[in-house]
A protein has these predicted regions:
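Short, well-ordered amphipathic alpha-helical segments that serve as non-catalytic structural scaffolds
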Residues: 18-31, 143-146
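Short beta-strand-loop/turn "lid" adjacent to the catalytic site in phosphate-handling enzymes
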Residues: 27, 33-79, 100, 106-115
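Electropositive phosphate-/nucleotide-binding environments in soluble metabolic enzymes
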Residues: 13-17, 21, 59, 63, ...
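A generic local structural motif
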Residues: 29-32, 86-88
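Alpha-helix termini
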Residues: 31-35, 150-153
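Phosphate-binding/catalytic loop of phosphoryl-transfer enzymes
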Residues: 80-175
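Short glycine-rich, Thr/Ser-proximal phosphate-binding strand/loop in the N-terminal lobe
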Residues: 1-14
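Short glycine/proline- and acidic residue-enriched helix-loop micro-motifs
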Residues: 8-9, 68-73, 129-130
Length: 175
């Protein structure tokens, strides 16, 4: 939806690149037009499900970041490889426009070891990265900050329980 106009296109795209090409077409022509050219886009954001312990904040996507995401794919085999395809397609379609990775696990990266370690041999953590990471962090962060706004309290003075209900569900204690 843009400028009060809603445009839908029921379609199946065989590749991320074809889907992005259609998005560009919709944004630059017809009823859904919101820009004249993709050069008007400042940046493209990508939700990345798993940043492991490597990424505690959003970052510009570089070839090194993509390689690290590939290395982290065993931690999220259904999500990270597809996310990488989306990133590569965006780079192909949108050219030099900066791409930014926003990590779902980043919100939970401040958990202390007593909260993220499992009662299993420590070598599993060292060798395989087995630990609690926390998921749906972008959702939990948003809800936490909205709750603080609604309650008219600084976020750092609140202790909250947030719930994410979607295709996946999670509950987080926010301190």
């Amino acid at each position: 939806e843009a400028n009060g106009n809603k445009a839908t296109t029921p379609a199946i795209f065989p590749t991320h690149t074809e889907a992005f090409a259609e998005v560009v077409k919709k944004m630059t022509t017809g009823d859904g037009k919101v820009i004249d050219d993709v050069s008007e886009i400042n940046a493209i954001g990508h939700r990345v499900v798993h940043g492991g312990e490597k990424f505690q904040a959003s970052c510009l996507i570089t070839p090194e970041v993509i390689e690290t995401l590939r290395e982290l794919s065993p931690l999220a085999p259904l999500h990270n490889p597809a996310g990488i395809l989306g990133i590569e397609a965006a780079k192909k379609v949108f050219g030099d426009i900066p791409n930014v990775a926003v990590f779902d696990t980043a919100f939970h990266s401040t958990m202390p070891p007593k909260a993220f370690m499992y009662a299993i041999p420590y070598e599993y953590y060292e060798k395989y990265g087995v630990r609690r990471y926390g998921f749906h962090g972008t959702s939990h962060k948003y809800v936490s900050y909205r709750a603080a706004e609604y309650l008219e309290e600084p976020i750092d003075r609140l202790k909250l329980i947030t719930c994410h209900l979607g295709n996946g569900s999670s509950i987080a204690a926010v301190d």
